[in-house]
Amino acid sequence: MNKPLKILLVSPEVAPLAKTGGLADVAGSLPKALAAKGHEVRVAMPRYRQVKEVNYLTDLPVEMDGSLETAVIRQGKLPGEAGIPVYLIDNYKFFYRDGMYGYGDDAARFNFFCKAVLSMLPWLEFQPDIIHCNDWQTGPIPLFLKVKHEDNPFYRETATIYTIHNLQYQGTFPRNILKTMALSEEFFVPERLEFYGQVSYMKAGILYADLVNTVSKKYALEIQTPEYGERLDGLLRKRAADLRGILNGIDYEEFDPATDRRLAVNYDADHLEKKGENKAALQREMELPVRDVPVLGLISRLVSQKGLDLLAAILDPLMQQDLQFVLLGSGEDYYQQLFSRYKVKYRDKMAVKIGFDPVLAQHIYAGCDIFLMPSRFEPCGLGQMISLRYGAVPVVRATGGLEDTIKDLHQYPGVGNGFTFRDYQPQALLDTINRALHVYRHEPGEWRKLMRRGMAADFSWSASAGHYEEMYREALEKRRAAMFKVG
């Protein structure tokens, strides 16, 4: 019987405390699934202005540029029976702002955060077996452990995992950040932190963590190629033996159409007619005519990664059909303005809400018939899993986690759970939507089977947490083997 592990998950955002994207959902859900398997799990994140329910623990000094900054350590907890502790690193200068990222001093802000986390653990007397880091904001932690704490007995047996949620966001900064990190110029070489004339926090995490993973098996393979590797494919190929792909999950208690209080009407796979009542409620909410036509939904950041150029290219021919389209998202001005113009052009068929509204998102999952994710690349994707749960049939591009989770009905008769295309071309997307519409309109029995298969699928966190558990133990063995080699 393996002994329970002590795990610290470090993330720049954790739902429901602070969220900009899917990383927050992962950081809020995975700890609960690990705790359910008997492990002692704690979480660390910055204390942003919007995080309210916290208790003061202590002040700790953190060295920055030769002077001392104060890290105020506060504690909250994740909702749920386990009450998992969340440690919040507070500093008014660095984190009391309107947003979470995108500031000129992000390099210093998250350098401070990473140093503060490693200063906090001895004070807490919480000695983790695993520090699980997530995305570029936490990349310096594996580096600091190997370079700054290599002789610190407190961390002697601690292994690090570094999870890449999206390789496109790399945390690259000017060379002078090395001084703030208290690192010599020796680190500004391609074999270490130098990345095309800058310093990369993402590269630090990939290079110095004991094991690295990303959030689907397919994406773990894709990022080792020039097409998807964002100029880090060479390093990732070098670390291929230490690179894993573990699919994210979704919280099946939160995302359950039978109990979701945000819905107009609750339903399950045995009462699919009630999904139609949610469609009518969505049409009324979005000021569309209440008609029995197929409703397509899209919930997305409005950025080029999400395949919106393909969608824009086919909207005119698509909207000539007898259907409706509901879009929720925010992002690049170009796409916000483009879709807002189409909303005016097709006002009886198309509804657009710019922004993020979590309640409306649930109404779209419950009210739409077809859910679109035509992504150029998609490390994992949660939207397609949620749409399956709510009986909305996904139309997706076969890439990353979308390929790992969605099987095309026509390629896999009797087991398919959606519709997929591979060529990144507008016509391929339109043809695939039309295939889905044909089944919806002309094969209603097959469509109901498709809905039920999706609703019965298991993309809960339990299986994914088991894979992380295996990876944690593997990282510990790797760490101990390295210690004995040195010792």
From Swiss-Prot:
Catalytic activity: [(1->4)-alpha-D-glucosyl](n) + ADP-alpha-D-glucose = [(1->4)-alpha-D-glucosyl](n+1) + ADP + H(+)
Binding site for ADP-alpha-D-glucose: K19
MF-aspect GO terms: alpha-1,4-glucan glucosyltransferase (ADP-glucose donor) activity; alpha-1,4-glucan glucosyltransferase (UDP-glucose donor) activity
Alphabetical list of SUPFAM superfamilies matching this protein: UDP-Glycosyltransferase/glycogen phosphorylase
GO terms (BP aspect): glycogen biosynthetic process
EC number: 2.4.1.21
Domain of life of the source: Bacteria
Keywords noted in UniProt: Glycogen biosynthesis, Glycosyltransferase, Transferase
HAMAP family: Glycogen_synth
Name of this protein: Glycogen synthase
Organism expressing this protein natively: Moorella thermoacetica (strain ATCC 39073 / JCM 9320)
